[in-house]
Design a protein with these regions (language model features):
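Domain-level signal for soluble alpha/beta catalytic cores
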Residues: 1-364
Length: 364
């Protein structure tokens, strides 16, 4: 397994619909009817079932489905030193729906927490999977902390000063995951998506430069035999979205200059624009694989296979077929509420990705 073989031509973003026993256990824990130990026991059991379900679906890259999290990002961020979770007045406002009000903010000098629970979570997942598949673990990008609401709390005089500490925390996080045995890590990143959405704002160029610096500095600490990918998202909650905008405003930086081993890109509808920005990858000597998120994880209907293959063919105008891959456009449950579909429909989507990829690229 090297950066030349990962991501696979059929890959996955990471999160899955929470099982009913897990939902019930989390509700009981919130109500004080289950202890933390009892909840962890249920989580362990349900993750073991999820691992088997992924194997049964024929996929090679296995995650824990983010089963231990309420949000794709907050659970990780609030366990860094200097970052706390809190209840704001409002949640994130998606298209026609709002999340529960919970967010993170800086409360002290930021650093890696050597007792961060995600390291133990990864070790448990690795033990469950054994040699049956490739273990993939997802965490939010350091860019998720670059919003003023996150850092501008009076602890740091400037964002640049704050960013330096965030960068070091993430370099230490990479080492901690690596030492725990992680060789496939993914940074999920809505910040790039927000830049696509807000590219006409006066602060855009400064925000883009800071985002690029964060990734370049952090990835410079990556061990040679560790694969780190990114997923660029525009929001995913209850089958709705948060942001719109094509990749054009960020492509020169993200596609042309960052050293990721793979880029999971939303391309399931017109919100993401066309493939032309992919041309910037030709300027990037790292040659990371580009994972086309052509299969929607928001809606249960299966896409037309011929149309998906035609879009893959269209993308080869800008990149060689071997550098391209296929995945769902996002996770199936970026929050514990999950998207509006059944588990059976979810697995049909997963199998569909595998089926199309084998027809296009053959076996990995």
């Amino acid at each position: 397994m090297t950066s030349k073989t990962l991501p696979f031509h059929a890959d996955t973003v990471g999160s899955y619909l929470r099982s009913q026993p897990l939902k019930e256990a989390r509700a009981k824990f919130a109500a004080g009817e289950l202890s933390r130990e009892q909840l962890t026991e249920v989580e362990d059991q349900e993750i073991a079932k999820l691992v088997q379900a992924q194997l049964d679906a024929g996929i090679q890259v296995i995650t824990d489905g983010e089963y231990r999290r309420a949000f794709w990002h907050i659970d990780f961020l609030e366990n860094l030193n200097g970052i706390e979770g809190y209840h704001p007045e409002h949640g994130y406002k998606f298209n026609g729906v709002e999340t529960k009000p919970y967010n993170t903010r800086c409360c002290g000098k930021v650093s890696w927490n050597p007792n961060h629970p995600f390291i133990e979570h990864f070790k448990k997942l690795k033990d469950i999977i054994g040699d049956r598949g490739v273990v993939k673990y997802t965490i939010p990008s350091p860019n998720q902390l670059m919003y003023p609401i996150q850092w501008d709390t009076g602890v740091y005089a400037t964002r640049a000063e704050f960013a330096k500490d965030v960068q070091q925390a993430y370099k230490d996080a990479i080492k901690a995951f690596y030492d725990a045995g992680c060789r496939y890590l993914q940074f999920d990143d809505v910040y790039w998506g927000s830049l696509c959405n807000n590219h006409l704002k006066p602060e855009f160029e400064a925000d883009k430069a800071q985002a690029l610096e964060n990734i370049q500095v952090v990835l410079a600490a990556k061990p040679a035999d560790m694969v780190i990918t990114t997923h660029v998202c525009r929001g995913n909650f209850r089958s709705t979205y948060l942001l719109t905008g094509a990749y054009d405003p960020i492509a020169d930086a993200l596609f042309g200059q960052t050293q990721y081993d793979g880029y999971f890109l939303e391309y399931d509808d017109e919100r993401s624009g066309g493939f032309e920005p992919l041309k910037h990858f030709s300027n990037n000597p790292h040659k990371g694989r580009v994972v086309l998120g052509l299969i929607s994880s928001k809606f249960p209907e299966l896409e037309d296979k011929a149309a998906i293959k035609a879009r893959i063919e269209e993308a080869t105008q800008y990149l060689p077929l071997e550098q391209l891959c296929l995945s769902p456009q996002c996770g199936f449950a970026s929050t514990e509420e999950g998207n509006i579909m059944t588990e059976a429909q979810q697995w049909a989507k997963v199998r569909y990705v595998e089926e199309i990829a084998k027809e296009v690229w053959g076996e990995d």
